[in-house]
Amino acid sequence: MSPRRLAWLAAFALIAASCGGGSSSPSSPSTPTTPTTPTTPTPPATSACSAIGGVAGTIQGITNGTSCSLATSAVVKLNMKDSGGQTVGGCSGTVIDRRAVLTAAHCLVGEVSSVQVFQGTGATIASASFSAHPSYSHTSSGSSGLDIGVVITATDLDRTPVPLLFSRDARVGEQAVVAGWGQDENGSSSGLLKAGTTSISNVASTWLEAAASMTSVNVCSGDSGGPLLLSEGGAWALGGVTSATSGGAYCNSGTSYFANLRHPDAQSFISRLVPGLTSK
């Protein structure tokens, strides 16, 4: 089954061994890097919320996925509007500066004329501008290029920005935290922010991959643009952006794909648009 893009259905939920959504496939990754023994211990599912700046809440029918407090997390929900003000899609994103959100390129192309940022509480914040990486291209047969984009907001975001991991490659076998607002394994969009853990199964120049298992989470419709976090120097940093999955209708199998922020073209694109970002 071809990997599917994860935009639409309003948000990014991170799910446990069961969610995968979207449409079309990323281009074939380049040769994987040599596996390296990971040094980061597996964070328990209940600690995943703290990795994204939230507080763990009740598990809402998601295997290994924990619902998180909305009041403090840097993982936000994006609603895309067309020129007539109609909603044309929904994604997740991560606050990386006081007025900047990192998300997926495929969330920002097509009919999108404006973006509304919802922090989980309070009013939405309008975009001042948004940009998809210029290398990104999508056709009926698949997509290519770096699936990353940046939303610049009109006013400050009330969240602590997440640093980006620019200094090293992800490692095969390394544990990671993913989070978002999308569908769960029952095909339900609960409107909850969720987080959980997974493991890196492949590393390529433009893509990171994580295979679904009974002990890991998987991503689903609405999860596009959300973070893949890696531990560095005792803190969590943004190493990838959720892009696509090869999972089935209930997001319970296959491989999830994340744009690799280690790629120099990704780093130069983000740094140009967000000169004040913090990296590790």
Regions found by a protein language model. Give the residues of each.
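Short conserved beta-strand and strand-loop elements enriched in small hydrophobics
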Residues: 76-79, 113-123, 174-180, 230
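C-terminal subregion of chymotrypsin/trypsin-like serine protease catalytic domains
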Residues: 19-35, 43, 48-51, 56, ...
